């Protein structure tokens, strides 16, 4: 059974150990030791990182996991393959570990305050590179978050002790104080006490006092599902780097605005109003162009019986071409519009024309090759031919259908 030194002293950064088992795959290894300061991933806390050094090898540990009671140190091997029984030195990535300890203790404080103020239970927790998240079983808003944040950071400033105790059997007086219930306990249970603020079971590593958490800052929150809200936050030195990132983004965004004075939300709304005004003007101009273009196309139309067929090589994108075609045939009775270029074909007709555009396109594709589909009034696709060939075949089919 591995000796879990990280529980005895979570501040220990290096120790000696002995290799129990080695599993190698290419340039990576999984190593089991007789004792370790590396915490394995679990309970929302990531596995530890660091270095394992032997006489003629070095393992850059990228992750630590637990499987069937064994702790595996996983990483890239440099040098010879480690041997069972070999003595090694473990060096913990302290910045990574300590940041996770700050985050984990911070989470306990935040969850305790949310429970106390709003009776919200924490149902999920995960630590990431520069932030952590919890999920709670109820709705939150900014007023609630700001109140909770103030309470949380008062607790941090008060420098309350963080005490971890292990029990074979949980005393009733402790069980009554738990923030979350313990159902199945197969072995010793670890209880984390934070002053008179929180008592909860936990298998993670924690700082010794609330002051070490530094600060807790909620970054954002949002609804995850019907009764589940996610809150993202950061703690300690990671909070400083995360807030610097956010502030650089904030001031950089503000610097791009015509009016560079805060608040950013007002500047964004000003830009949105300008964009909306320009979009309305663009739409007005588009309609004017369509009107002009429609009149020009009608003059170029070919009479097929009582109907006017317009063929045109159009370079607009499909979306704009389709919008124009629908508008054009709606305004002009007894018309058929055939648009084509190297990328697409688009056939549209006024509702009064007794020919299906879907069937017309299918006939053209059957003869020239391609693919497409649509409705009786509008069809589109791609035909393996030049626009002129497409128009010739389509006109021939239309004359046949309209019995001209």
From Swiss-Prot:
It holds the Pfam family tRNA-synt_2c. PROSITE patterns: AA_TRNA_LIGASE_II_ALA. PANTHER family: ALANYL-TRNA EDITING PROTEIN, ALANYL-TRNA EDITING PROTEIN AARSD1. One of its GO terms (biological process) is alanyl-tRNA aminoacylation. Zn(2+) binds at residues 104, 108, 202, 206. Signal peptide: none annotated. Its cofactor is Zn(2+). This is Alanyl-tRNA editing protein AlaX-L.
């Amino acid at each position: 059974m591995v000796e879990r030194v990280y529980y005895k002293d979570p501040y220990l950064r290096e120790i000696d150990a002995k290799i129990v088992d080695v599993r190698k795959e290419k340039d990576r290894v999984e190593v089991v030791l007789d004792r370790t300061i590396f915490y394995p991933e679990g309970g929302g806390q990531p596995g530890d990182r660091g270095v394992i050094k032997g006489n003629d090898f070095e393992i850059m540990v990228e992750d630590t996991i637990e499987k069937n009671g064994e702790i595996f140190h996983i990483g890239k091997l440099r040098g010879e393959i480690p041997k069972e029984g070999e003595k090694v030195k473990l060096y913990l990535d302290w910045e990574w570990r300590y940041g996770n300890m700050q985050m984990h203790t911070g989470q306990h404080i935040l969850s305790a305050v949310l429970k106390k103020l709003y009776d919200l239970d924490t149902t999920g927790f995960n630590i990431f590179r520069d932030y952590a998240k919890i999920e709670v079983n109820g709705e939150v808003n900014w007023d609630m978050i700001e109140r909770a944040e103030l309470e949380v950071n008062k607790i941090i400033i008060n420098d309350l002790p963080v005490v971890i105790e292990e029990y074979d059997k949980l005393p009733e007086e402790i069980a009554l104080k738990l923030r979350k219930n313990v159902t199945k306990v197969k072995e010793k249970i670890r209880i984390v006490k934070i002053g008179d603020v929180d008592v909860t079971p936990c298998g993670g590593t924690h700082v010794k006092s609330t002051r070490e958490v530094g600060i807790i800052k909620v970054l954002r929150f949002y609804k995850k599902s019907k009764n589940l809200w996610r809150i993202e936050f950061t703690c300690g030195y990671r909070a400083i780097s995360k807030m610097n990132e956010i502030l650089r983004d904030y001031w950089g965004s503000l610097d791009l605005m015509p009016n560079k004075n805060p608040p950013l939300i007002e500047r964004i709304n000003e830009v949105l109003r300008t964009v909306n005004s320009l979009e309305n003007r663009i739409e007005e101009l588009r309609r004017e162009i369509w009107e002009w273009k429609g009149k020009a196309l009608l003059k170029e139309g070919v009479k097929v019986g009582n109907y006017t067929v317009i063929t045109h090589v159009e370079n607009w994108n499909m979306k704009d071409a389709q919008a124009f075609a629908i508008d054009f045939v709606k305004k002009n009775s007894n018309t058929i519009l055939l648009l084509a270029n190297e990328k697409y074909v688009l056939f549209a007709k006024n509702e009064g024309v007794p020919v299906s555009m879907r069937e017309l396109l299918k006939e053209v594709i059957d003869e020239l090759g391609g693919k497409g589909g649509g409705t009786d009034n509008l069809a589109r696709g791609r035909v393996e031919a030049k626009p002129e060939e497409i128009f010739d075949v389509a006109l021939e089919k239309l004359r046949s259908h309209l019995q001209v």
